[in-house]
Amino acid sequence: MRAAPPTSLQALIEALKVLPGVGPKSAQRMAYHLLQHDREGARKLGDALRGAVDGIRHCTRCNTFTELEICGTCSDPERDATLLCVVETPADQVMIEQTLTYRGQYFVLMGRLSPLDGIGPKEIHLDRLLARATDPELGGPASEVIVATNFTSEGEATAHYIGEMLKARGLKVSRLARGVPVGGELEYVDAGTIARAVMDRRTL
């Protein structure tokens, strides 16, 4: 009879497999490393995960991650509330912030349209985006909406859908310039390239 790992160890391995790019072997290596060489690090990791899961929420205005009802970017009086940049993820927002060239606000979709995966307009909060872009109580109407979804097929489809939706309301909509490679994701593009793509954006 083959010996099985302890139940709690197996549970740890299964939990680690939820991380992107982590398969069974990698998860097993991580679990054994933490238990064998870095139990204090494992405790810190567990505490940090619990703190983030319990303490992080979505900003009621832009949908990004925050510990407050309204995030620091949305509550910053020095940001241009009428200039709105739409991104897929909080990581994409961070990349644009690192360019130090954009002083508007954001809306974070938390995904992109993917009908085959059951992800439609509702799942990426396009109703909230429309409200943010048009409702004066939320900072609207926007003077310009920059669609900064990734240049993947799903990202392009999402950009087209958002562009048509907002232009139908009379809003100016622009798209990042093609400095970002086709198929590229903002999270993996250098800040200089993103800065140029924002500055050279084209009107849809």
Swiss-Prot record:
Q: Which InterPro entries match?
A: DNA_Rcmb_RecR, Rcmb_RecR, Rcmb_RecR_Znf, TOPRIM_dom, TOPRIM_RecR
Picking any one GO biological process from the record gives: DNA recombination
Q: Which gene encodes it?
A: recR
GO molecular function terms attached to this record = DNA binding; zinc ion binding
Q: Where is the Toprim domain?
A: 82-181
Q: Which SUPFAM superfamilies match?
A: Recombination protein RecR
Q: What is this protein called?
A: Recombination protein RecR
The keyword Magnesium is assigned to this record:
no
Zn-finger (C4-type) residues = 59-74
The protein's job, in short, is:
May play a role in DNA repair. It seems to be involved in an RecBC-independent recombinational process of DNA repair. It may act with RecF and RecO.
Return the similarity comment: Belongs to the RecR family.
Q: Has the keyword Lyase been applied to this entry?
A: no
Please give the CDD domains that the UniProt record associates with this protein: TOPRIM_recR
- List keywords of the entry alphabetically: DNA damage, DNA recombination, DNA repair, Metal-binding, Zinc, Zinc-finger
- Pfam families attached here? RecR_C, RecR_HhH, RecR_ZnF, Toprim_4
